[in-house]
């Protein structure tokens, strides 16, 4: 089974997240994309105290109508920081026959060398770096951390960097949606409409539960 992994704080999940998942699913013929909300993200401090369970519920609402999308709460079942390598190891134990495609924004990939055990991530799965506004990668090989660059070989015909482990790094350009969770939170706090930025069930849930208002 070819399985995509899309992690994030999802605070809240929005249409750009969903479109990225769909573009990668389509481009790489994935059987499923698993959305994995981060319980305690090491790279992005959480703004506000939005509980993990609430963010998971928003992801469930956003993905409920797509049989190719699934949601996992495995990071909420662990203590400590939500390191991606720990999540990958757990998924490989749970689903030993799957081939995983780790989906990451180009902005995060450019900082990949600062990630916990990033070398092990390259040896654990395929990686799909997805273009994000303001973070275009023009030379994928140059974006690889210098310390591990000799472990890769570029395959021009397939536009991928093959790692010595057998996995590859790909770059997917041209996903134009520029939507930010922080802008959605700001609109919600001001009582303004967030319609068409998030799926309708998520917008309703945010409004009904007063998730981003101070008097929640």
Curated annotation (Swiss-Prot):
Record GO biological process: NAD biosynthetic process
Family of the protein in this entry: Belongs to the NadD family.
Disulfide bonds: none
Superkingdom of origin: Bacteria
NCBIfam families, per the entry: cyt_tran_rel, nicotinate (nicotinamide) nucleotide adenylyltransferase, PRK00071.1-3
Record keywords, A-Z: ATP-binding, NAD, Nucleotide-binding, Nucleotidyltransferase, Pyridine nucleotide biosynthesis, Transferase
Catalytic activity: nicotinate beta-D-ribonucleotide + ATP + H(+) = deamido-NAD(+) + diphosphate
Leading EC class: transferase
Pfam families from the UniProt entry: CTP_transf_like (PF01467)
Protein's job: Catalyzes the reversible adenylation of nicotinate mononucleotide (NaMN) to nicotinic acid adenine dinucleotide (NaAD).
An example Gene Ontology molecular-function term: ATP binding
Claim: NAD is one of the keywords in the record: yes
SUPFAM superfamilies the UniProt entry points to: Nucleotidylyl transferase
EC number(s) stated in the UniProt entry for this protein: 2.7.7.18
Name the record gives this protein: Probable nicotinate-nucleotide adenylyltransferase
Involved pathway(s): Cofactor biosynthesis; NAD(+) biosynthesis; deamido-NAD(+) from nicotinate D-ribonucleotide: step 1/1
InterPro entries, sorted: Cyt_trans-like, NadD/NMNAT, Rossmann-like_a/b/a_fold
Gene3D superfamilies: HUPs
